[in-house]
Amino acid sequence: IISVSPALFRPEEGKHYSVGIHPWETGATPDFELLERAAAHPSVAAIGETGVDRLRGAGIDTQTDVFRRHIALSESLRKPLILHVVKALDIILAVKKECRPAMPWIWHGFRGNATMAKQLADNGILLSLGSHFNTDAAASIPADKLLVETDESTAGINETAARIAACRHISLPEVIALASENLQRAVAYTV
């Protein structure tokens, strides 16, 4: 899934996308109409990146309001939500508890520890690991909550998956199968 902002969304045949107003882009007035149009496109499999970043972007209240709009869109279109979160776990979990979404949430680029991974998994959030991750967390994430990503890394997906496999003491094909099944289940509502 390729993550793009609504303004840059130019779908190509055979590719799947997520569209969202990234927390870093919440300082300008967000164009929710453009987001809604792009999100409704059949090649869009997920909504986001969205969430709250305490280190960058507009104020927390603005980011949280934009996040809630993304949640509503995710629910109305029945597409999973991709999260970008920095030092805002408390806000994300409070909003999730309040909104009680039916659609899956995917924590993009998860770098937290095993305790945080358990807390998120217990709240039904899938955890996507990129090239930088906590090895104890990678070993402890429940099998049905594990995803693998490349993001902007030069490391290929297989290289990242192999490192995760080593942490979990399983084979590379097993990690790829787990992550593939989990992604298929997460986007099953849309494709």
Located regions from the model:
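Mid-domain alpha/beta scaffold segments of enzyme catalytic cores
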Residues: 1-191
